[in-house]
Amino acid sequence: LEGLIQEAYPDFAEVLRRFGSPPIRSTATLAGNIANGSPIGDSMPCLMALGATLVLRRGDKTRSVALDQFYTGQKQNVLQAGEFIEAIELPKPVAGQVFRAHKVSKRFEQDISATCAAISYSLKGGKLSGVKLAYNGLAPAPCRAPKLEAVLEGQAPADVKAADLDAAIAASFTARDGLRATWAYRSLVARNLVLEFIEEQKEVA
């Protein structure tokens, strides 16, 4: 799996390499990570930013659910009794698409996240377009960040202001400290990762 993802989305592959030890990675599955629904699950922000869809099966019936609509709360999801995740559908990369992701943790490997952020976008006329941004560690479940996406959409990378991102973070998430990091740290990192993700596009724009 890492090899397939490496070619298309190197940042996602890096997140996967930092997920647990090799024995864990060789037996674990993405579907299991998703179904477990940890608020700090590492694969989900990447998959959400890439527009992943889940195929759910119960008996001979299947249905498709966007991953960013899968969770209803902490460790809660839309799976019905007897239903399981049969497949994860991921769109192929398109020309001009930018995907960035980064996990922040105390240790580089084999550690749970303070937060993990992932973003997908393209540049059209020098402005950010089709922005999808997702996090873990900021809410009861991994999630998209539509208020932050709105701040970014249609803006030139150089025009994005830290203060606007801070306001969107405050409006999107309930402040709470955790064992791995304070809210002040998480919210600062959440903002700075976005700025880092678009920084390299300023010269292009």
List each model region and its residues:
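C-terminal structural segment of proteins
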Residues: 1-205
